[in-house]
Amino acid sequence: MSGMSRSLFGLGLRKPHYGDFLDGDAPVAVDFVEVISENFMVPGGRPRDVLRRVRERHPVALHGVSMSVGSADGIDRDYLARLRLLADEVDPLFVSDHLCWTRIEGFNAHDLLPLPYTEEALDVVCANIAIAQDVLGRAMLIENPSSYVAFDAPMTEWEFLDAMCARTGCGLLLDVNNIYVSASNHGFDAQAYLAGIPADRVAQIHLAGHSQGRTLLIDTHDRPVPPPVWALYEAAIAKLGPVATMIERDDDIPPLAELIDELQVARDMANAHMRRAA
C-alpha cells in the first residue's frame, strides 16, 4: 500500500450526510469515504447515482457485511459477481468484509456471527477468501469482529488472523473498537492482540463507539469514540505507523462537523506519532 493511502483519514458515508458531500464544496477534511457495499450493489437508482457523484470528489472504500467468508457451504458467487461490477465501477481504495459467517444453506442471518478458531474453520475461511480474491481480481481486507461468545478453540483470534493472512495474502482491516469490546467481553489482553497481529498486513483501521449492555459491551456505533478506544488506537499506530483510518457512525448520527472534529483527533494522534518517530 502506498504511503499516500496510509495517511488518509475518512468517514463512513451515511444517508444523513449525502447533502454535505454532494452540495457545494466537498469536505476537505475528509480524505476518503467508506460505504456499505450491499447498499450500492443494485445497478442504477439513486444510491448508485449518489455513489458515482461522491466518487468524483472523494476516493471510496467498499465495506461489506454479507460475504460470509466463514460459511462452510461455500461463498455466494452471484454476490461476488455483483460486488466485482461495483468495484470495477468505483475503483475502490479497499474492498473489505468481516471474519464471520452470516449465511447457511441460503438463509442469511443478517448478523456477523462468530467462528471457532480451529484448523477446520481456517481451511473454510481461506478457501472462501481465495475464491473471493480471484473473482474480484484484487486482494481484499478482512476485519476482526466484535464478539459476545467465544468457543473453546486451539487458536486465539490474532493467531487465526495471522495464519489467514499468510495463507491467502489478504490484508487486515483492524477495528480497534472491536478489539476493545471483545477483550472486555472475553477477558483477553488487548495489547497482546496488537502484538500478535501481522503488522505488515494492516491496511486500514476502524474507530467507533460502543454501549454497555447488561453484562457485555456491544459494538453499537451510536456514540463517539471513547477514551479507552482512543488509547488503544494510539498504541496501535505506535506499533503499525500511520494507517488509513476512518470513523464509523451508524446510529444517532450527528452533524458532519462533529464527526470531522472527531476525525481530527485521529489525525492529530497519527501526526504526533510521526513527529516522534522522525
Curated annotation (Swiss-Prot):
Pfam families: MbnB_TglH_ChrH. InterPro entries: MbnB/TglH/ChrH, Xyl_isomerase-like_sf. Disulfide bonds: none annotated. NCBIfam families: PRK05409.1. Belongs to the UPF0276 family. This is UPF0276 protein Swit_4400.
